[in-house]
Amino acid sequence: MNTSTIAIVIGCTFILSGCRVSKPGAMESEMAKDVKHKITVGGKNTPNPIAATPENIKDGQEHFGHHCGICHGLDGEGTGVPFAQKMSPPIPSLSSSDVQEYKDGQLKWIIENGINPSGMPSWKGILSDEEMWKIVNFVRHLPPKGSLGIPAVYKEEQEEHEHMHMHEKDSK
């Protein structure tokens, strides 16, 4: 590498190190919430056709754990998900008023269509309408934070990490 290339790389690194994503202010957050709730998220007037019976909530919990738990945690709070708060935007707590203020049809619409450009994928064509509605029922009846443990994929990773640290301590 020649001197000018090194200078450009160092200059770009210096400039970019000053760039960071700042949290939106209260006014920006409130405006974004209003836009999401009133304009961009469909299904506002669509009622949930699946009754919130214990059986349907349990079915919703199973579908949620299988499809949604890797990002939202098994409890909808991100419990045990190592990157939940590192995403931009962070993965929301599904028990938060921001999420719970959505109508059932809006929650189903989000599950079905996803939210771009966030990491929320579309489940259209993967989950049936009935499965999505059951997930909505589960989201309406979330268990206490941490009560369901952490997703198996992260539990295995955590156990491996702890196992490695135990061996490191033993070898010292």
PLM segments and residue spans:
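Bacterial N-terminal signal peptides that target proteins for export
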Residues: 1-7
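C-terminal motif of bacterial Sec signal peptides marking the signal peptidase cleavage site
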Residues: 15-18
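Bacterial signal peptide processing site
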Residues: 20-22
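Electrostatic cytochrome c docking/interface patches
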Residues: 26, 30-63
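Flexible coil segments in periplasmic/lumen-exposed cytochrome c-class electron-transfer proteins
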Residues: 42-43, 104, 122-172
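Sequence/structural segment immediately N-terminal to covalent heme-attachment motifs in c-type
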Residues: 53-77, 84, 107-109
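Detector for the c-type heme attachment site
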Residues: 72-78, 112-113, 125, 140
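Short Fe-S-cluster ligation motifs
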Residues: 98-113
